Amino acid sequence: MKGIVLMLCLVAGVHSWSFWRGSPRVEPHEDVDQACRQAAAQGNCEFYRCLERRFPCGHDGYATKIGLHFCARADELHSQFTPQGKLFMNGSKTCVTSTLLPVYESYSARCDDIEDAGADAMRTCSYNEYAGMSSCTFIRSNMDVYNQMLGTDEVSRLMGLGNARLLFRIFVDGARCGATVASERFTSLGGSIMGSVGDLADGVSNWWRNL
């Protein structure tokens, strides 16, 4: 558990460097669409395409890299969840898209702000109960498919957000619910980042000495 917390601090610290730049404000590229509002109300993955079309942030933006990817991944694995687990996932997806609807409807937005709003929505919605299930009950009764949903690629995408509170919720609280496989992937990837940061620091140090 201590290793996971250490990785949280490292990932959040590395990610915070990017905030020195900030992101420019993006003006809406298309009008608010009633069909997109309906998609948000239904937890439909199409909502993330709507969000990206209105406020384009590219392949590395939240709507495409996180929102759409994880929504589509959940749909792909839908048949493998328990009947109650399917209801839980539907409720969780709808909570996130509904929470992000005001962002979609806003007159302008920064990509960083969309990312923060998305991460906060994912974390906040994870505390709710859906179909009478808590997140811990959901994880324990759908462990195999949950571990599939959080593969190495998915863990890497979440780490890219650098949102320590969301990462804590998924990987620390998740481990307490028995999701140790996903937490081990997080720790392993975090170790790789630590090694990369160490190599970078050594390179800078050598460059400085040779000046």
What kind of feature is each model-predicted range?
Residues 1-16:
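Cleavable N-terminal signal peptides of Sec/SRP-targeted secreted and luminal proteins
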Residues 15-208:
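Mature extracellular/luminal domains of secreted and GPI-anchored eukaryotic proteins, especially small
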